Amino acid sequence: MMGNKLTLPAELPDEQDLRAVLAYNMRLFRVNKGWSQEELARQCGLDRTYVSAVERKRWNIALSNIEKMAAALGVAAYQLLLPPQERLKLMTNSADTRQMPSESGI
C-alpha cells in the first residue's frame, strides 16, 4: 500500500506553496516518528484518506486539523507551515550564535 511507505519526501517544496510545505513537513515529521498515514490519522481522529490527500496536496486543510496533526506529531502548529529552507536557516543562525562567544574568546 503506497500511503503506508515510510519514505522521506524526495525534494524540497516551493517556499511560496503552503500546501506543498504542509505536505512536506507532515510527511517528514510522520516518517521520523515511524508512523504510517493510517497511524497519524488514528492519532488525530481523522480518516487516512484525508491525511493522504493533504500529503498529496489535493485538499486545503482547516486550521483546527493542522493543530490536531501538530499535537499528534509533537510539534508546534507553525512548524508544519514553516518552509524547510527557513528551518535550516534558523538552525544555522542558532548554531552560529552559539559559536560566536567561544570564537571571540569571551
Curated annotation (Swiss-Prot):
Activity regulation statement: Repressor activity is inhibited in the presence of the DNA mimic protein DMP19, which interacts with NHTF and prevents binding of NHTF to its DNA-binding sites.
Gene Ontology MF, one: DNA-binding transcription factor activity
The entry's DNA-binding region: 37-56
Induction, as annotated: Negatively autoregulated. Is most likely cotranscribed with glnD.
Keywords assigned: Cytoplasm, DNA-binding, Repressor, Transcription, Transcription regulation
Assembly: Homodimer. Can interact with the dimeric form of the DNA mimic protein DMP19 with 1:1 stoichiometry.
Function statement: Transcriptional regulator probably involved in the response to nitrogen levels. Down-regulates its own expression as well as the expression of the downstream gene, glnD, which encodes the [Protein-PII] uridylyltransferase, a key enzyme in the nitrogen regulation system. Acts by binding to a specific palindromic DNA sequence (5'-TGTNANTNACA-3') in its 5'-untranslated region.
Protein name, per record: Neisseria hypothetical transcription factor
Organism whose genome encodes this protein: Neisseria meningitidis serogroup B (strain ATCC BAA-335 / MC58)
